[in-house]
Amino acid sequence: MNYKTVDVILERALLGDDISPQEGIVLLTQTDSGAIASIRHTADKLRQQQAGDTVTYVINRNINFTNICEQHCSFCAFRRNDGDADAYWLDWAGILEKSHDAVQRGATEICMQGGLHPQAQIDGKSLPYYLKLLETIKQEYPQIHLHAFSPQEVQFIARMDGLEYAGVISALQNAGVNSLPGTAAEVLDDQVRRVLCPEKINTATWLEIISTAHKLGLHTTSTILSGHIETPEQQIGHLEKLRSLQQIATNQKYPARITEFIVLPFVGQEAPKSLRRRVGRDQPVLADALLLGAVARIYLGNWIANHQPSWVKLGLAGATEALNWGCNDIGGTLMEEHITTMAGAVGGTCMEVETLQNAIASIGRPYQQRDTLYQPVESAKQLANTVIGNG
């Protein structure tokens, strides 16, 4: 593909046009350094137009409440069987302790997900257990934003209890869920899913649950697990499905939307040998993740303005570089992270606010704390300065 074609695609994108799947594939398959530099420049310019120069971050905590899981995804090093020596399942006191710690450290969000544990029930039902998880936190900390339970977990509860997805989502919402993580998406292509995660929900179910959440007024995020067995065509197919989903929510005037898109590069160090052999490496290729992030900005930016790298997957230096490739947000502090770390990631499990701020400042961009829905949050330090200044 010659430069002229790439330039024409990029010029159209800068004029505000949505590029086609075929054009997305053209961009994603470029190997020439000049063409890739043009893609990066365009993504960076669109980021500036669509999201501004300020880089945002959120103070949040992950709570992975159990690693006991009935499924056996080929890339997952987190799951354990009930009875394994290193299996765990947090009790209510443990959930509260982690929540208290999060609030003490200034968190505005708790992100809560876990393995699919068949015994996670109250009176023989799954939904009451998940509701108690939420109520345990919300009764003590009503102000905290609970970003909780992936579409896979919604389907698990519905299947275990014989419920409709809408009924499960409404019940979770009423008990305190404020937004839904768009994880378990991996790649929205059933051919890939049959290899990576054959027991997981299929593409249509993931899309249905996310769309149902939007109809019911529950915002969601969106993700892609990249850099394993998927092709550029399948990556673009994934982006196209997300764009279509957001277009439907917008055109139908649903009360909620996708708030952000996150590239999650595959970390395979602890993955099963068969998948490791097929992928051929254990850590992400930064250049591939950056190019996908740039193309995602060009492809999705008109519809999903906020794009985030994963410092857990890429390391802080890689995530900071992604801010020059179309990303406008650097993610959260997390405070603890098990799923990616157990897979062999080297990015760490916790990031101090000052570390994130310094990373953003190192590329000459201003920073701003935000909440889960991308509204600015005034830090305690900013508030103190305001009070002193007004005094």
From Swiss-Prot:
The record's free-text note on cofactor binding: Binds 1 [4Fe-4S] cluster. The cluster is coordinated with 3 cysteines and an exchangeable S-adenosyl-L-methionine.
One term of GO molecular function: iron ion binding
Protein name in UniProt: 5-amino-6-(D-ribitylamino)uracil--L-tyrosine 4-hydroxyphenyl transferase
Family label: Belongs to the radical SAM superfamily. CofH family.
Residues at which [4Fe-4S] cluster binds: 69, 73, 76
Domain named Radical SAM core: residues: 55-302
The organism's place on the tree of life at top rank: Bacteria
HAMAP family to which the protein is assigned, alphabetical: FO_synth_sub2 (MF_01612)
Pfam families, sorted: CofH_C (PF19288), Radical_SAM (PF04055)
